Design a protein with these regions (language model features):
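Targeting-peptide/extracellular-domain and disordered-appendage signature
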Residues: 4, 17-18
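A glycine-rich, coil/turn loop motif that links secondary-structure elements
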Residues: 189-195
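Bacterial N-terminal signal peptides that target proteins for export
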Residues: 1-7
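Short, hydrophobic, well-ordered secondary-structure elements
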Residues: 167, 196-198, 206
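Divalent metal-coordination and catalytic microenvironments
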Residues: 172, 196, 202
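Long, internal stretches of domain cores in catalytic or enzyme-like folds
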Residues: 184, 199-204
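Bulky hydrophobic segments
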Residues: 19-189, 208-365
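Bacterial N-terminal signal peptides
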Residues: 8-16
């Protein structure tokens, strides 16, 4: 009888997670932040926007309350600090520049996919996420290996973190190829920005740690846990004050970014990182804290044999017209194609910058 009760309780717990996952909406797009720079100006077409300046920097202790991104936060609220969440750039001595919007975006997707994993991990299933130039398809692959309750939680969190980060890598690629997602502006000035993917990976790590420790959190509880986790992470990375962050960015004017350019001009951003890896070092030379995500479970089985993401040709293939035919003609791309796409982007940018007389510099220690 006692064994039956334990089984029933386990079933009820799993059902509770599955019901929650079925009611949970995927994160809506991305938080509209942040091109690298400070006091950024904008223009609409050829007309500069008067009285507009985007400071783009937040204080280490004033990033606000995390909210699972269900789309309720306005663009102006996130950008201008009118929402409970305040996003922007923070300089840390160990992690370099951190974009809190990127941290939060990938944390939210890690949470979302973790919830889906409770019902689908080890089974045959797929879901389609809204297109970012290509349709984003998340696929679960059937497995025969039984998992204990603890293993399922760990596997679910690790697979969610990796998949969420893969989505972030794709977002950088889609930005470069001209995706438009915020207010009708393209995002060329943000594509492959040097702090982006490091920040995304930090978000994946924080969410993974939260979910392994406390897997039954609802969105409000997860958001509260992220508040503490982000605050702790910034402290451990030795985050500096808002004024120091601003000074650090201003010192890079003409090296990593160009204050004379107005958004959405692509060349407002000069220095980009096209290296797509699961092991990342900060681009700022004195920052030394490496972040890594594993491609395998502790059994050495590749995570993507359980859960993978693919990018399927949709209605915006003209964005990829100039790609070499060997990759352009593939109807589905996977993470294995990412570096080839990034290498192409890097070469195109090098050629364009050479013609424009723009030179990117790495900072000397």
């Amino acid at each position: 009888m006692r064994r039956l009760k334990i089984i029933l309780l386990a079933v009820i717990a799993v059902m509770g997670l599955n019901v929650h996952a079925s009611e949970l909406n995927a994160p809506v797009g991305v938080r509209p932040c942040c091109a690298f720079g400070v006091d950024l100006k904008a223009q609409l077409g050829s007309v500069p926007v008067p009285f507009f300046s985007l400071e783009n920097v937040v204080d280490k202790g004033s990033v606000g309350d995390h909210h699972y991104n269900d789309g309720s936060a306005s663009i102006s609220g996130s950008l201008l600090g009118l929402a409970d969440e305040t996003n922007g750039l923070v300089f840390t001595k160990l992690g370099g520049f951190i974009d809190t919007a990127h941290v939060r975006d990938t944390a939210d997707y890690t949470y979302y996919i973790f919830q889906l994993n409770q019902g689908y991990l080890g089974t045959s299933h797929h879901i389609d996420l809204p297109a970012e130039l290509r349709l984003r398809r998340v696929t679960w692959h059937p497995q025969t290996q039984p998992l204990s309750k603890e293993q399922k939680i760990t596997y679910s969190a690790e697979a969610a973190a990796l998949t969420a980060f893969r989505l972030a890598q794709w977002h950088e690629i889609a930005q470069w190829f001209g995706m438009v997602s915020v207010g009708g502006f393209d995002e060329l000035a943000s594509a492959f920005s040097s702090e982006d993917l490091y920040s995304n990976m930090l978000g994946a790590h924080l969410a993974k740690q939260i979910l392994i420790a406390t897997p039954m959190l609802n969105t409000k509880q997860f958001s509260a846990a992220m508040d503490h986790a982000l605050e702790t992470a910034l402290s451990e990375l030795n985050a500096v004050t808002k004024s120091v962050t601003k000074e650090k960015i201003q010192q890079l004017d003409g090296i990593w970014w160009d204050s004379s350019k107005r958004l959405p001009n692509k060349w407002a951003l000069i220095y980009r990182d096209y290296h797509l890896s699961l092991s990342l070092m900060p681009n700022y030379p004195t920052a030394t804290h490496r972040l890594q995500l594993s491609e395998t479970f502790d059994t050495n089985q590749p995570i993507e044999q359980w859960l993978s993401v693919s990018f399927i040709a949709a209605d915006e293939e003209d964005a990829f017209d100039k790609l070499p035919s060997a990759i352009r003609t593939k109807s589905s791309w996977s993470s294995q194609d990412f570096q080839s796409l990034a290498n192409y982007a890097e070469q195109v940018d090098k050629n364009a910058m050479s013609k424009l007389g723009i030179q990117a510099h790495k900072i000397k220690p």
